Regions:
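Acidic, low-complexity proline/glycine-rich segments
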Residues: 1-21, 43, 95-105
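Conserved alpha-helical segments that form or flank metal/cofactor-binding pockets of metalloenzymes
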Residues: 1-9, 71-99, 166-169
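Acidic/His metal-coordination segments adjacent to aromatic residues that form catalytic metal sites
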Residues: 19-39, 99-125, 142, 175-179, ...
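Helix-loop segments that flank and shape redox-cofactor active sites
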Residues: 25-30, 48-70, 132-147
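Alpha-helical scaffold segments that form or flank carboxylate-/histidine-based iron centers
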Residues: 30-41, 59-78, 121, 146-158, ...
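Internal, conserved structured core segments that host functional sites
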Residues: 111-164
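Extended, helix-rich structural scaffolds rather than catalytic motifs
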Residues: 181-306
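Short, basic, low-complexity termini and linkers enriched in Ser/Thr/Gly/Pro
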Residues: 305-321
Length: 321
C-alpha cells in the first residue's frame, strides 16, 4: 500500500470517528502535532501547580488547605498521565522535561501571572479550570485514543477543582465589602488571561485547520472561547460581580455573548517567555527537577537491578537489604 493510500485510509477512519491507537499507522505530521499538543498540555499541568501551590501554607482554614493540597496533587498526576500519553508516540519523558526546562517547550499562558491574594486561588479554580474543562471535553472526543481517554479522567477530576474554586469565590462574594472587592479584583486580572487560554484566534492559528481535519481537535479556538464566555458570564453576574468588559452583552440575534477580544500580542509575548512570571516558573521547575534527581537515579538503579534479577533468577539476594 502506498503512502497516499495509507493516508486516505487513515483519514477515512478518523472521519468515521474511529480512534487511532499507538500501534496504528499515522501520518508523521499527525504524530508531531499530537506530541506538541500533549507535551504543552502536560507542561501546563506541571507548571500549573505553582500559582496556587504557594497558597497552601496560607489557606484560610483547615478545609480550604486540604482541598487545595488535593487539587495540586491532582495537577501533578494529570501531568504524569499526559507525559505517558506522549510517550506512546515515541517522545521520551526526559526529552519533554529537558525542552520545558530549557525554555524550548511552551505551556499555557495563564500560569505566568502572579497570585497575590487568596481570591486568585478561587478565581483560577473557577474561571481557569472551567475554560480548561470546556477545552478538554472537546479533546476527549478527539481521534487519538490515549489522549482522549486521559482527557475523560482529567475532566472528571477538574470538575472537582471548579467546585472548589467556585465555593471559595462565593464565600468572598458574600463576605465583607473588602472580601467582595478582593474577588472582583481577581476576576478583573484573570479575565483576559483566561480568554487567551483557548489559543490565538482562528485567523491567526497555524495548527487549527490540520488539527480539525484529523480530529485531534473537534472545535476551533474561537468556538471553545465563545462556549466559555457563554457559560461563565451569567455565573459571574449571578454572584453580584462584574465582567471586566463594558462591551460584554448578550446578543439575541446570535444567542451568544459579545465580548472584547484579548490583546493577542500579549498572548504571544507571554507564551514566548516574556510574561510576568515566566522566569520564576521555570526557575521553580529547575529547582524541583534538580532536588528530585536522587529519586530518579535511585529508581533507575532499582529498575536495573530488578531486570538483572529477572534475567538471572539464581542470583541470591540479601533479604535484609
Amino acid at each position: 500500500m502506498t503512502d497516499e493510500q495509507k493516508l486516505a485510509e487513515f483519514e477515512a477512519r478518523v472521519a468515521r470517528g474511529d480512534k487511532v491507537e499507538p500501534g496504528d499507522w499515522m501520518p508523521e505530521e499527525y504524530r508531531k502535532n499530537l506530541i506538541r499538543m500533549i507535551g504543552q498540555h502536560a507542561h501546563s499541568e506541571i507548571v500549573g501547580q505553582l500559582p496556587e501551590g504557594k497558597w497552601i501554607p496560607y489557606a484560610p482554614g483547615f478545609r480550604r488547605k486540604l482541598t487545595l493540597i488535593a487539587k495540586v496533587q491532582d495537577e501533578a498526576g494529570h501531568g504524569q498521565l499526559l507525559y505517558r500519553a506522549a510517550e506512546t508516540l515515541g517522545k521520551t519523558r526526559e526529552e519533554m522535561m529537558e525542552e520545558l526546562l530549557s525554555g524550548k517547550a511552551k505551556y499555557s499562558n495563564v500560569f505566568n501571572y502572579p497570585t497575590p491574594t487568596w481570591a486568585d486561588v478561587g478565581v483560577i479554580g473557577w474561571l481557569v479550570d472551567t475554560a480548561a474543562v470546556i477545552n478538554q471535553s472537546m479533546l476527549a472526543q478527539g481521534s487519538y485514543g490515549p489522549y482522549a481517554r486521559a482527557m475523560k479522567r482529567i475532566c472528571y477530576e477538574e470538575s472537582f477543582h471548579i467546585k472548589q474554586g467556585y465555593d471559595a469565590v462565593v464565600a468572598l462574594a458574600k463576605g465583607t465589602p473588602e472580601q467582595k472587592a478582593m474577588a472582583q479584583d481577581a476576576i478583573n486580572r484573570w479575565w483576559y488571561p483566561t480568554l487567551m487560554m483557548s489559543g490565538p484566534p482562528d485567523s491567526m492559528s497555524e495548527h487549527t485547520a490540520r488539527a480539525m481535519r484529523w480530529r485531534i481537535k473537534t472545535k476551533t479556538n474561537d468556538q471553545v472561547r465563545q462556549e466559555f464566555v457563554d457559560h461563565i458570564v451569567p455565573q459571574i453576574r449571578a454572584l453580584g460581580l462584574d465582567v471586566p468588559d463594558p462591551e460584554c452583552r448578550y446578543d439575541e440575534a446570535t444567542g451568544h455573548y459579545k465580548f472584547t477580544p484579548p490583546d493577542w500580542e500579549e498572548l504571544k509575548r507571554v507564551v514566548n517567555g516574556d510574561g510576568p512570571m515566566n522566569k520564576e516558573r521555570i526557575a521553580a521547575r529547575k529547582k524541583a527537577h534538580e532536588e528530585g534527581r536522587w529519586v530518579r537515579e535511585a529508581l533507575a538503579v532499582g529498575g536495573t537491578r530488578e531486570k538483572s534479577e529477572i534475567r538471572n533468577p539464581n542470583i541470591e539476594t540479601n533479604a535484609n537489604c
